[in-house]
């Protein structure tokens, strides 16, 4: 008999993960319009502001694993999730571009932490015999959020919805997700004794070529996902560009079949 995968705990963290990414993806394609219309930002400024989020998320990730092994995991997860959620409200009160950039950096740090801690916790609560299947469903939640989140955000924007409403939709999604996350029960894991943190623990020489390849792949991906809606508007495409993200998410599911072919 297989170990049970679909438990109350698993459903709760699956819902928390989906709602977090839904809130994230709902807002992402709308932000360039918001910065241009509200702060009168030019293209260079928009790119710099949006990149602050990604850079901040990347900077915290190498330290996230160390923190999760040193301190209790669920409190760190909830703290990061709450911070990520609260920043959506912060965007609403950001009266200057400088303050918006500050919130954007904090948002990126919390996103980097909450995603790593969420991945760690879901592994902890799953039976080891069904870990691959469980992680597959967990990743599928991200793809579903990616397929409908941007479409929802762009639909609201194209329909003339106020930016406050769009931000509140992301905030509401993550608030419900935070409630789901707080219901997840985790078992106590004693802290792992580690050597003092140092730079060399984050650098794997064998991984540099693969990391560089991923970097080159991520640059056009980031440019496309951030600017495709604005570009479509500039060249006169009338159809909703939200479907672009839907089809892209469907295409990303091909990785499952690729893995099967490789094995």
Where are these regions (language model features)?
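Helix-loop boundary and gating motifs at the non-cytosolic
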Residues: 9-47, 222-231, 235, 244
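Structural signature of the two symmetry-related core transmembrane helices
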Residues: 75-89
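Residue-level signature of mid-helix packing/kink "hotspots" within the transmembrane helices
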Residues: 54-62, 146-147, 249-253
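Helix-to-loop junctions at the C-terminal end of transmembrane segments
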Residues: 60-72, 254-259
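C-terminal membrane-cytosol helix-exit motif in multi-pass small-molecule transporters
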Residues: 171-190
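Paired small-residue
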Residues: 98-106
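Cytoplasmic helix-loop-helix junction between adjacent transmembrane helices
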Residues: 105-141
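Juxtamembrane intracellular "pre-TM" segments in multi-pass secondary transporters
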Residues: 1-7, 186-213
